[in-house]
From Swiss-Prot:
Protein name: UPF0758 protein R01728
Stretches of the chain forming a coiled coil according to its record: none
Region of interest (Disordered), residue spans: 23-44
GO MF terms, alphabetically ordered: metal ion binding; metallopeptidase activity
GO biological processes: proteolysis
Motif (JAMM motif): 211-224
Domain MPN intervals: 140-262
Keywords: Hydrolase, Metal-binding, Metalloprotease, Protease, Zinc
Family of the protein in this entry: Belongs to the UPF0758 family.
NCBIfam families named among the record's database cross-references: PRK00024.1 (NF000642), radc (TIGR00608)
Amino acid sequence: MTKIPPGEPDELFDAADERGFFPEKRTRNSPATAPAPATDTHYHGHRDRLRARYREHGDAALADYEILELILFRLIPRRDTKPIAKALLDRFGTLAAVFGAPLHLLQEVKGVGESVALDLKLVATASHRMLRSELRNKQVLSSWSAVIDYCHAAMAHETKEQFRILFLDKRNTLIADEVQQQGTIDHTPVYPREVVKRALELSATALILVHNHPSGDPTPSRADIDMTKLIAEAAKPLGIALHDHVIIGKDGHVSLKGLRLF
């Protein structure tokens, strides 16, 4: 049996217990077999009822915070996760915004440490991969709603501007999806020559430009419009078409092609 050496500080037991495996803080003098208070396990029946409701009725029977609770059950097995789920939604507003939030902001919510934040981001990554897989081997222009869903999930809640390019072949099938630049809160530097160079490297014959506005408002700026025109002009002589430039906001998107801005 491992014993604590005499004189070891009680702080040995004070390490962060993010996943709640120890319902009470223990010290050297605490009895190892002390029974946990009844309130520490009151949430187990709630978890069973919530799982049963989801099993029988699906997600339509659950509020957003309850869906988040179901996920947190696995991540934090020994703690009441309802307050954490509600705190996350209070902080970020929507389920999508919770999963889209940066790691450091997730960890500012009480009860969420690095491990739980990473696991929440893993759920978001799985969702993004699933949406992106819907674009594979499909004609992108005929799957436009899938393109928007994917781009919105991947970019709408980024806190900095991100410039992404979808490279297409002559059948308008997706060849590559690449983030070209990461900028500041309101600006991303884009170099038309580099965009065209990368298209030639991939043997792409068409492009869709996508970037986000962290402010949430997808209205294009004059700089957005001018940059789009420059890329279209650089690509056209090389037989590369610019199909669209889409700006993603938190609650919607704008198509520059749809607005006839280039």
